[in-house]
Amino acid sequence: ESGDYIFPQTESGQSMRWSKFKDKDPRDIFDIVSQRVFPAIKKMKHGKLPDFNMAGDLVEVNEADQYSNSENTAFSRYMEDAMFLIPTPQVLQKIVTGLEDLYTHDIADGDMQGDLYEYMLGKLASAGRNGQFRTPRHIIDMIVELVEPTPDDTICDPACGTAGFLVASAKYIREHYEDTMTSDQWDAYASTMFSGFDTDRTMLRISAMNLMLHSISNPDVDYKDSVSKQNDISSKYTVCLANPPFKGTIDAESINDNLKAVTNTKKTELLFLALFLRLLKKGGRCACIVPDGVLFGSSNAHKSIRKEIIENHQLQAVISMPSGVFKPYAGVSTAVLVFTKTGAGGTENVWFYDMKAD
């Protein structure tokens, strides 16, 4: 059982297990969760929780643990600044009882736990911040199906938010290839197959948790301003999927020079297109959401990124979406671009589709 690996085999280690504390008195549950479980999760390493000594002090997981196979870096890193905000034992007991009831009757199946988490994210993230709009689930699924990811792909979302595209790609791969995947492919699936970047640490914490609930035990999500000088990744991925921020501009000084060489602009929606081309290996596919301005804008920066994609790579599809897709931002008109990085052109027949309803 995986829990035997995660929890220390001591009395204090075992006391952190849900089955051990869920039926206790509310005060005891509160003490165990706030003083043990929560601090332990923040210090999780190699997929293992740390233990506590007799004085109640946390004992960190040994770095050289012979059983450690992969460090749970993303999860512990983005839990570092998390705060325990549940105010009283009674509130926590209601949460524990509610989750136990839900688990017993509905979500013992792992996929359901992920679905529940995504449902809660929908409630949490209905408000767009800094140009982020929560991408509706059915639009994400459509985009993933257009790209048809396989277990041999390495998939990146450089504006990952809550990791919706990465989770949908993981589900697609499992649904289509679960019976034929090799152990090496499963190892990659759990760690290196999916990468995400964001500039919001809260989002990274949420996305790491979302991926872990979908069997990606050591997700590669990182704090990175994708279009800045700090991001020097190139030719690493075979698939890019994203709904990059398209309300923002970025400080000209911090923009990565090789993106400016493709499109000299401060507009994030254009810089991200140049970024996708840089992140992808030759032959890599991209499907991304862009505002209509990218298709019709008349500035030199708009023209140069369109020319780059059409003449030097292979544009395959432009799918115009209804303006109400991003409720409640009804005024935002968007499209999906699908293209392949070739470095040698190849744009011939482009599929244009006008989606009237979603």
Place the predicted regions along the sequence by residue.
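Structured alpha-helical segments in the cores of large, soluble enzyme domains
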Residues: 272-280
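Short glycine-dipeptide loop
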Residues: 280-286
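Acceptor-substrate binding/catalytic loop of class I
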Residues: 294-298, 328
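Non-catalytic, mostly N-terminal accessory regions of nucleic-acid modification and defense proteins
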Residues: 1-146, 150-151, 220-229, 320-324, ...
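Conserved S-adenosyl-L-methionine
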Residues: 130-242, 247-251, 258, 266, ...
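Gly-rich Lys/Arg/Thr-decorated short loops/hinges at beta-loop-alpha junctions or inter-strand turns
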Residues: 122-125, 251-257
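Flexible, glycine-/basic-rich loop-and-beta segments that form/coincide
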Residues: 327-358
